[in-house]
Amino acid sequence: MDAFSSFFDSQPGSRSWSYDSLKNFRQISPAVQNHLKRVYLTLCCALVASAFGAYLHVLWNIGGILTTIGCIGTMIWLLSCPPYEHQKRLSLLFVSAVLEGASVGPLIKVAIDVDPSILITAFVGTAIAFVCFSAAAMLARRREYLYLGGLLSSGLSMLMWLQFASSIFGGSASIFKFELYFGLLIFVGYMVVDTQEIIEKAHLGDMDYVKHSLTLFTDFVAVFVRILIIMLKNSADKEEKKKKRRN
């Protein structure tokens, strides 16, 4: 009910971006601000670890099903550890980030072979989107976007069902394109919702910055992968059009 009431309370008049909206930062207490600093610092370290994992794949071709299974297993292990095992959980986060990077490595290698600038553009684009949507979540009224969580969960379930159906029955290019853009929309939405949820949990005393960093890390990677695939597909389409013109 809180989610729906905050939604109706935030209708026209409360969503205007003005100087007053910047005052919403005052709703974030100093303790929560320090928590967010730790979350984003840990997230940056996890992204560096992930880049190292991708580099290892480029060198030794280690990415694949095993690294994906290892990444999922490490994340589950991390989430099952009690919060007081701080160092262990932090180590597990970085290990899972390295394995995630190795798992995404094959896609990154394709991008490097096609055009390295695509990889850089995709990462910068993801970083800009992440900063903008995270800032939007911080500037918004508390719990303003949390009502979207249910809609995003339903959308994610639909996306997983589509991918499962496509893997069994086969899928067309149009379905694949829909999955890409729909998935991008879903995970960009999660950037906003997860950021507000982290802030709200911190206000309630949940200062588990390792778990919160993991949440944002998975959002970042999901958006990055989809942007990279979209850019690679667009590049391939352009090359195909050029070949047709030459012929």
Curated annotation (Swiss-Prot):
Protein name as annotated: Bax inhibitor 1
Family: Belongs to the BI1 family.
Subunit structure: Interacts (via C-terminus) with calmodulin, CYTB5-B and CYTB5-D. Interacts indirectly with FAH1 via CYTB5-D.
Keywords: Acetylation, Apoptosis, Endoplasmic reticulum, Membrane, Transmembrane, Transmembrane helix
Entries under PANTHER family matching the protein: BAX INHIBITOR 1, BAX INHIBITOR-RELATED
Topology term for the membrane: Multi-pass membrane protein
Expression across tissues: Expressed in root tips, root vasculature, flower tissues, including stamens and sepals, and in the base of siliques. Not detected in mature leaves.
Subcellular location: Endoplasmic reticulum membrane
Cysteine-cysteine disulfides: none
Disruption phenotype: No visible phenotype under normal growth conditions. Accelerated methyl jasmonate-induced leaf senescence. Enhanced sensitivity to water stress, heat shock, toxin, tunicamycin and pathogens.
Residue(s) carrying N-acetylmethionine: 1
Stimuli inducing this protein: Up-regulated by water stress, heat-shock, mycotoxin and pathogens.
Entry annotated with the keyword Nucleus: no
Chain's role: Suppressor of apoptosis. Modulator of endoplasmic reticulum stress-mediated programmed cell death. Involved in methyl jasmonate-induced leaf senescence through regulating cytoplasmic calcium level.
InterPro entries: Bax_inhbtr1_CS, Bax_inhibitor_1-related
A single Gene Ontology CC term: nuclear envelope
PROSITE patterns, sorted: BI1 (PS01243)
One Gene Ontology term from the biological process aspect of the record: very long-chain fatty acid biosynthetic process
Organism: Arabidopsis thaliana
Transmembrane segments: 58-78, 92-112, 118-138, 145-165, 173-193, 212-232
